[in-house]
A protein has these predicted regions:
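Iron-sulfur-associated redox domains of electron-transfer enzymes in respiratory
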Residues: 1-243
C-alpha cells in the first residue's frame, strides 16, 4: 500500500485507525500518504467501518483508490461496484477503486465486549500497546505482557461474524494474513489487478518473496481455517431459522 501511494499507482486508500477519544475504538479513514498508512498500521479486533470512508473519497473525486478491509467489507465493496450498475455512485466505485487488499479474519469482537474482557483480566485498555490473537490472546501493555487463553473471549464475538463463510477475503485482489513464520505474511494474489501491483513492488525491490510450498504447514493451516469458517455458520442458521 505504501508502495502504491509512493509510485502514484493510487491517490488514496481506505483503511482503519483508532479514535483518539476512546481506547482501541476503530474508525474509518481515507489516507493520502505513506506516512498516514504507517500511522494506521495494526490489527483491529473490534469492527472497523472502513467502507464509510468510501463516501469521502467519492465526494473528493479521488481518481485512483485502494481499499483495505476484512472479508465482509470486501464483499460489500463488490456489491457496491456491481449490483447496482445504474446508480452513479456504483459506477464511480467500479471505475475508481483500483485494487483491494483483503485481510484474513476468523471473527471480531464487539467493542463493549472487548472492554469488558479487559476489565475481567485486569487490564486498563488505555495502557494496551498491542493486541494479538493467535490461538491465545497476547496483550502488550505499558506495564508488561500477558498471555491469556482465548476461550474467555469467545463469548464477546460479534454475532454477525457467526454467519460469515469467508476467512481469506476471496473477493479481494490481494489477500494477506499473519499465518506465516515471524516476519513473513502469507499473500494470495487473486486477480490481474492485484498481480500487477504485487509484481511491480517485487520488481522495484519493495517486497521480498519466498514462494510457499504447497505442502507447507502454513498453507495447510490456511486451508483448514478457510474450511472451518466455510462450514461453521450452518448450525447457527439452523438454530435461528429452523432446519
Amino acid at each position: 500500500l505504501v508502495y502504491a501511494l509512493e509510485s502514484k499507482l493510487v491517490d488514496a486508500a481506505v483503511v482503519s485507525t483508532t479514535s483518539p477519544e476512546k481506547p482501541m475504538y476503530p474508525v474509518a479513514k481515507l489516507v493520502f500518504s505513506p506516512e498516514e498508512v504507517l500511522e494506521c498500521a495494526g490489527s483491529r479486533y473490534t469492527y472497523a467501518p472502513n467502507l464509510l470512508a468510501l463516501r469521502e473519497a467519492y465526494e473528493l473525486g479521488v481518481n485512483k483508490l485502494a481499499v483495505v478491509g476484512v472479508p465482509c467489507q470486501v464483499s460489500g465493496l463488490r456489491y457496491l461496484q456491481h449490483s447496482t450498475p445504474d446508480i452513479e455512485v456504483a459506477k464511480w466505485y467500479e471505475k475508481h477503486v483500483v485494487f483491494s487488499v483483503g485481510l484474513f479474519c476468523s471473527e471480531v469482537f464487539t467493542y463493549n465486549g472487548l472492554m469488558k474482557y479487559f476489565e475481567e483480566v485486569g487490564v486498563d485498555p488505555s495502557t494496551v500497546e498491542k493486541l494479538n490473537i493467535k490461538g491465545k490472546v497476547f496483550i502488550k501493555t505499558k506495564n508488561g505482557e500477558l498471555v491469556m487463553p482465548l476461550q474467555q473471549l469467545h463469548k464477546y464475538e460479534r454475532p454477525a461474524c457467526l454467519f460469515c463463510r469467508d476467512y481469506s477475503a476471496e473477493l479481494a485482489d490481494i489477500s494477506v494474513g499473519g499465518l506465516a513464520s515471524e516476519g513473513w505474511t502469507i499473500t494470495v494474489i487473486r486477480t490481474n489487478a492485484g498481480n500487477n501491483i504485487f509484481q511491480s513492488a517485487v520488481k522495484h525491490g519493495i517486497l521480498e518473496v519466498n514462494e510457499i510450498d504447497l505442502e507447507s504447514k502454513q498453507l495447510r493451516l490456511l486451508k483448514k481455517l478457510c474450511e472451518k469458517k466455510r462450514t461453521r455458520p450452518l448450525p447457527m442458521i439452523r438454530t435461528v431459522f429452523g432446519p
